[in-house]
């Protein structure tokens, strides 16, 4: 009588399977905000405030770029003032 034994062999993974993730990346910094403070001297063309949308409005002698950046049109002193319903505008006063 011939007896054949069946061997039950189970192989396990030698390396763990690696799943994918949807995290692990970040956007580059945009460096938004005030570049010149109230009372500071600004030359013509210098950036006063970088923003997304009109958080701060342009006043006298201040230009508004197409990305809503505020810049000085003339040499002078930067002046931030409140107006209307909790809004802020920035002007440049000639020195």
From Swiss-Prot:
InterPro entries: Ribosomal_bL27, Ribosomal_bL27_CS. PROSITE patterns: RIBOSOMAL_L27. It comes from the Bacteria. SUPFAM superfamilies: Ribosomal L27 protein-like (SSF110324). Disulfide bonds: none annotated. The N-terminus is cleaved by ribosomal processing cysteine protease Prp. GO terms for cellular component: cytosolic large ribosomal subunit. GO terms for molecular function: structural constituent of ribosome. Residues 1-12 form a propeptide. Pfam families: Ribosomal_L27. Keywords: Ribonucleoprotein, Ribosomal protein. One of its GO terms (biological process) is translation. Residues 17-37 are annotated as: Disordered. HAMAP family: Ribosomal_bL27. This is Large ribosomal subunit protein bL27.
